[in-house]
Amino acid sequence: MNRFFIVLIFAFSLSSLLGIQATEGKWIAPSDANHPNTWMTFRKDIILPKRPEKAVAQIAVDSKYWLWINGQLAVFEGGVKRGPTPKDTYYDEVDLAPFLQKGKNQIAILVWYFGKEGFSHKSSGQAGLLFNLESRKFVLGSDETWLCRIHPAYGSADAPYPNFRLPESNIRFDARKDMTGWQTTECPETLGFSNALVLGTWGEAPYNYCCPLKLKRA
């Protein structure tokens, strides 16, 4: 019996250490998003009966993200390079309550997928976003109902290329292809958005365990 309790305590401790938990959110991406230096856009609209006092989001990506709520930038350059272990992923915890409102809320996320490794980054090999938002009154998770598409304005620049130690690519931005107002448009489908592809759930390969990032964001 004592051995059972020791194993149980160890399992709970390990789960806490690795950030293992059940979430509504699933790993999602556009169906054609798996090339190095890919920029992806995601949209989800929700209706809230009132503004929550607290609404904590767990957000994990490969590799970086920017988050807007109702057109207001809530997270600038979120996420860090993968590598809590050779196979696992970090996630951010952010209270989004200050950005939410009664009624309609528009969630928009831009994700930058490095798609290659460096001395400080372990690529999962698959572009992806996992988003989970929890409040006392509701839970919202990323799934196939989210709309997404690759951002057409971003591309890779010509040589010279970054040093092989870096996973980032040089960026080319063609303003002629920009999707102005994609964060708040009432009909993302008119900009080419379509339903996301579900890649897996929390803890599944290739992203594996998600570990909480022990940093505070402004």
Regions found by a protein language model. Give the residues of each.
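Beta-strand-rich ligand-recognition modules
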Residues: 66-124
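Positively charged n-region of N-terminal signal peptides that target proteins for export
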Residues: 1-4
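Bacterial N-terminal signal peptides
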Residues: 6-16
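Short beta-strands within extracellular/lumenal beta-sheet-rich domains
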Residues: 36-48, 89-96
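Extracellular beta-rich ligand/substrate-recognition surface
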Residues: 30-40, 80-89
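A short, structured loop/turn motif at beta-sheet edges
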Residues: 50-53, 97-106, 133-141
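An acidic-aromatic loop/edge-strand motif
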Residues: 23-32, 108-218
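Aromatic-lined ligand-binding clefts that engage carbohydrates, nucleic acids, or primary amines
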Residues: 46-49, 53-68, 107-109, 193
